[in-house]
């Protein structure tokens, strides 16, 4: 068995990994969870728009990154639950993405998105990657 396989076999399966995130303007922290690649793919697929080029007769799919980020935040946020109908009704909206837009200021959304990206392993900084590549 190679070293990577040994390492993987020794690791515990991480389930329900969560982290608390302090968001300015809210007295209590938000709780976000990690998602799986399968969940992420499913969310990404719902955010794709397929276009057909008549000249080349080719189909291409483009992902709406803003919609993907909103849906990823909604899926990963345990508390508050953006899918809660009562909370949506209080803000006068329908849907988790609409609630996020109504409830959070742009800076608050970015802070929450960064926490979601970090817990899901998207935290690699380009400067860090560049430094690693140089060495």
Predicted regions and their residues:
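Short acidic-hydrophobic surface loop/beta-edge motif
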Residues: 16-25
């Amino acid at each position: 068995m190679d070293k990577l396989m040994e390492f993987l076999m020794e690791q515990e399966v991480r389930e329900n990994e969560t982290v608390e995130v302090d968001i300015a303007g809210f007295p209590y922290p938000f709780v976000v969870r990690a998602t799986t690649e399968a969940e992420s793919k499913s969310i990404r697929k719902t955010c794709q728009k397929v276009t057909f080029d008549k000249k080349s007769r080719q189909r291409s799919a483009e992902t709406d990154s803003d919609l993907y980020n909103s849906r990823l935040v909604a899926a990963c946020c345990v508390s508050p639950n953006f899918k809660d109908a009562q909370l949506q009704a209080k803000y006068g909206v329908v849907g988790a993405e609409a609630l996020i837009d109504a409830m959070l200021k742009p800076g608050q959304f970015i802070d929450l998105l960064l926490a979601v990206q970090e817990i899901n392993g998207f935290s690699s900084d380009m400067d860090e990657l560049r430094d690693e590549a140089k060495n």
